[in-house]
Amino acid sequence: MAANEMNGAAVKGVYPYIKHFALNDQETNRCSFLLTFASEQTIREGYLKAFELAVKGFEGNAIAAMSSFNWIGTVPSCANNGLLNNVLRGEWGFVGMVETDYDGSYGYMITDHCIRNGNDLMLGFNSAESNKLTE
């Protein structure tokens, strides 16, 4: 269903986003270091399948994804190499842009880690010293 909606929007000139990628289990207090632990099988079958169908079924030229606030295990999803590079880009052939969810003043979306591990753009701002590129 998502791929069809994205394709319909793209025909009208809309740049579709899939979000929140992935394991976004709760909205209440989601910025308070929500850590989600799950087996790879659970993640692939329960959390990623809908995203996979959307990515593989999209027929347009431009697509984007927004990473979620939560952590997958001990790694923020916005800096999760396995999720963003290995699965999304590698296995599924995603060629679009990946953006973080809003990075207010939470302090854990470290730009250097995000960019090195598959995010292309930081949404919002953070003036924390930890949020500077090192190279």
Name each model feature, range by range:
Residues M1-E135:
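Glycoside hydrolase catalytic-domain context in secreted enzymes
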